[in-house]
Amino acid sequence: MLKRDQVSEYLKKLEQNERKILRDLGVKFGRYHVFLYQLIKPEAVSLRTLLWKNFYQKFHNLKPPTFGLNFLDDKEIKNKNFMLLCGFERFDNFFVRIDILERLFVLIINSSSKENSEIKLVPEMLNLLGCSKDNFKKLLQKMNYKIFEKENET
């Protein structure tokens, strides 16, 4: 898993046929990350975290989040590199699974109106993350979106 902004120069130089080859191999070019979806699966995460702990010879008390969770609100997690290794992106105390974050971005794009840049909060967004409406609003703010109430809507 790579943060897209860390490899943006490399990605700009990739030809479309090279991108197609990578896509055919399972590489996902998301808004925020470039990743292999197969590496977010539980078995791959377990193996990667085991190897990571053995390589660094510390952090043995760190455990990956429960598989199946898409959203975490945890102020105790300090090691963002470990969480990224587990497939989660950090937004202060919120963690969102990378593939879910990309799907959320698609929902946001699809819910925005053409005449302005407003997005409407739809239940599918909350269901995708599995978080409360309040936490979702806070997450959007941490992702640099502006939140405002509009006649009982968000």
What is the predicted function of each stretch?
Residues 1-121, 128-133, 138, 143-152:
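Acidic, serine/threonine- and proline-rich low-complexity intrinsically disordered segments
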